[in-house]
Regions:
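N-terminal targeting or signal-anchor segments and their processing/structural boundaries
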Residues: 1-179
Length: 179
């Protein structure tokens, strides 16, 4: 109640038994949310019927603005955390997998640098495609446009401040290399 539907991001897990909810609104939010969930429920006769359940969600980790030591603040608390993985033996099939800790609300995938390095160690820009995972909205797959060549190394560079997560934090630069 009180949050516009366009400011809510939801995602089910793989087996569809858990729902993750994020509020995409920079304004301070209350520590308690009341959520109405409308779904199809099986009754005692095995028939599907529309049902509405109300849930009270309390944030047990709500951060209070008090005195906190700078020692308590970790780097992950102030940046959009992204993990990039690529296995050399499967990178051609599965690509470079980028997974953000939280949903991103601003992105600049055209700023990625995909570089091929030939056996003479000469670098050249290579084309790539980006697709969002169909199950996990925080995961993106970066694949080369051209067939990968034997003996070449490939590097994916993510420049800093090109992606902003739902918490308002920007990413750090990172680089992953496979051969």
């Amino acid at each position: 109640k009180g949050v516009k539907p366009e400011n809510i991001i939801t995602q089910f897990n793989v087996i569809q038994d858990s729902l993750e909810i994020w509020v995409n609104d920079p304004k301070p939010q209350p520590d308690t949310f009341y959520v109405s969930v409308r779904y199809m429920k099986t009754d005692t006769l095995g028939m599907l019927n529309s049902a509405v359940d109300e849930f009270k969600l309390i944030n047990p980790n709500r951060k209070t603005f008090g005195k906190s030591s700078k020692k308590d603040i970790k780097h992950e608390d102030t940046t959009a955390v992204v993990k990039i993985e690529a296995a050399p033996e499967t990178v051609e099939q599965y690509g470079f997998v980028m997974e953000f800790k939280y949903p991103i609300v601003e992105s600049a995938f055209d700023s990625l640098k995909f570089i091929s390095i030939n056996p003479k160690q000469e670098e050249s820009a290579a084309g790539y495609t980006v697709t969002q995972d169909t199950v996990n909205l925080r995961k993106y797959i970066v694949r080369p446009k051209d067939k990968m060549q034997v003996g070449y190394e490939y590097k994916l560079k993510l420049p800093h401040r090109k992606f902003r997560d739902i918490n308002g934090f920007y990413n750090d630069s990172t680089e992953v290399k496979v051969s």
